[in-house]
Amino acid sequence: MHCGRRVALCSALVFSFAAIPPVFAQQTVEVVIQKYRFEPAEVQIRAGDTVKWINQEKRTSHSVLFAPEQGGESERFFPGESWQRKFDAPGRYVYSCGPHPEMKGVVEVVAP
C-alpha cells in the first residue's frame, strides 16, 4: 500500500470514530433518608439513570411519593432498607415522603 493511501485510510478511520456520539454508562445516585430529611434534597441525573433512596433512620419507615402522573408512591421501606427507581424521561420530578409530607425532594432528569 502506498504511503498516501495509508494516511488517507488512517484519517478516515479516525474521523469516522469521532462522529460516533459518546455512550454514557447508566449511573445510580443515592439519596439518604435521615433525621426526617432527604439528603441531598435535589439531584440531577441523565435519562436512564437510577435514584436509590436509603432509609438510615433508627425507628421509622418512609416512602417516596410522586404525583400520580409521575409514578405515584413507593412501598414503605424501613430502617436499613432501600427503594430505587429508574428515570427514563427528562423532566422535573418533585416528591415527598407519604407519611411525612414535610419531607421534600426533587429529581431533575436531563437528556443524555
Language-model regions: role of each:
Residues 2-4, 10, 14-112:
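Extracytoplasmic copper-binding redox domains, predominantly the cupredoxin/blue-copper superfamily
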